[in-house]
């Protein structure tokens, strides 16, 4: 056999270039490894290889909003064109404003809130009401209007006209024509900033007055106008092509997976067996962790992903990267907003020995349907099984001063238990006498309270009548 058909042994393994992997799997080999062992489950699919129905229902469209229709109208049109159940957008644009409007479809609408709060970028044309003495004044005025600014919504707005603080992160003057009193500038700002108000403030600062002539949004959150921007006509044409020729390539081109909005988040990779538990709202624990990113701090927003690159949920980190590397147990992250549908992956909880025994005892009637003890429950189970459902997390007392109240509480409980045992040992006649005494005592207390109220009311009436007499004498 010739040498060209033989695979020769090598000491170096071929490197896979993960920088070209799609979406949330990019630079996967640079993630820190917690565990290399897990059982792959064939459920789920890579975001770009989902079947068309689930691809559309977990997709986002970076739409170039036309001038004149409102954002809600545009979103309603897309809902009608794609024949989907739900649509939402990443932040309202005024009717005359054009540019990036991220339209989320069905399952992706769960990310709308996070995109509405993300930063925005605009290109704006401002018309000044008079010529400037020095053309450089406009650039200097824009520089002054960066940072935290007070803004009141314009006269015609959909919200209450309250004074609010909004931040302008950066701004650049692109062009200025002093003869025509028109300036074009770019601004990066916080969500909820009114560019119309900014233009009015700019005119006031320059001493000539001004207003906004035209506006275009060039970035909204994670997507800019360079990231696969499509028009309403593109959406309509793609749906028409699919309906008439069954060619889904155009629909796949205009719709992007929802994972594109989460590329900026720190990632935590979850084992396939833990995915469905997280979808049902469980906290992610250390045993369910596969890989995690550098630089995660406590209470950071992170995205939980599967080994196929699907987003499971947006979560709040309960451990930093350092803790994740060293801890052998504990909560990694709490779910803030679940994205994935339940039961896409199979259930993999309740398979331990105690859980299986509990299941069997429920079936035999030795426990009730909630897993609580009943009259048929064996004594050994009652003594050995510890329910953690209502147990509060116990921490070691920091000092002796904290120990004392705990001891007192234990003593108090012991006394209560003794009293209860005494109560049980009493005869029915003794119990009846005690009940009657208690009722008499309660009646007496009520009577005393009523008398006190009456006395107070009479005293108040006497005071008011005296005051009236004094006034009449004057």
From Swiss-Prot:
Catalyzed chemical reaction(s): uridine in 5S rRNA = pseudouridine in 5S rRNA; uridine in snRNA = pseudouridine in snRNA; a uridine in mRNA = a pseudouridine in mRNA
Coiled-coil ranges (or none): none
EC class name: isomerase
Subunit structure: Component of the small nucleolar ribonucleoprotein particles containing H/ACA-type snoRNAs (H/ACA snoRNPs).
InterPro entries attached to this UniProt entry: Dyskerin-like, PsdUridine_synth_cat_dom_sf, PsdUridine_synth_N, PUA, PUA-like_sf, PUA_sf, tRNA_PsdUridine_synth_B_fam, TruB_C
EC number: 5.4.99.-
Region (9 X 3 AA tandem repeats of K-K-[DE]): 431-460
Gene Ontology biological process terms from the UniProt entry: box H/ACA sno(s)RNA 3'-end processing; mRNA pseudouridine synthesis; rRNA pseudouridine synthesis; snRNA pseudouridine synthesis
Family: Belongs to the pseudouridine synthase TruB family.
Ranges of the Sequence repeats in the UniProt entry: 431-433, 434-436, 437-439, 440-442, 443-445, 446-448, 449-451, 452-454, 455-457
Protein's name in the database: H/ACA ribonucleoprotein complex subunit CBF5
Biased composition (Basic and acidic residues): 361-372, 400-433
Chain residue ranges for the region called Disordered: 356-375, 390-474
Biased composition (Basic residues): 434-456
One Gene Ontology term, aspect cellular component: box H/ACA snoRNP complex
GO MF term list: DNA binding; RNA binding; snRNA pseudouridine synthase activity
NCBIfam families in UniProt: CBF5, PRK04270.1, unchar_dom_2
Active site (record annotation): 94
Described function: Catalytic subunit of H/ACA small nucleolar ribonucleoprotein (H/ACA snoRNP) complex, which catalyzes pseudouridylation of rRNA. This involves the isomerization of uridine such that the ribose is subsequently attached to C5, instead of the normal N1. Pseudouridine ('psi') residues may serve to stabilize the conformation of rRNAs and play a central role in ribosomal RNA processing. The H/ACA snoRNP complex also mediates pseudouridylation of other types of RNAs. Catalyzes pseudouridylation at position 93 in U2 snRNA.
Assigned keywords, A-Z: DNA-binding, Isomerase, Microtubule, Nucleus, Repeat, Ribonucleoprotein, Ribosome biogenesis, RNA-binding, rRNA processing
Domain PUA per the UniProt entry, residue ranges: 265-340
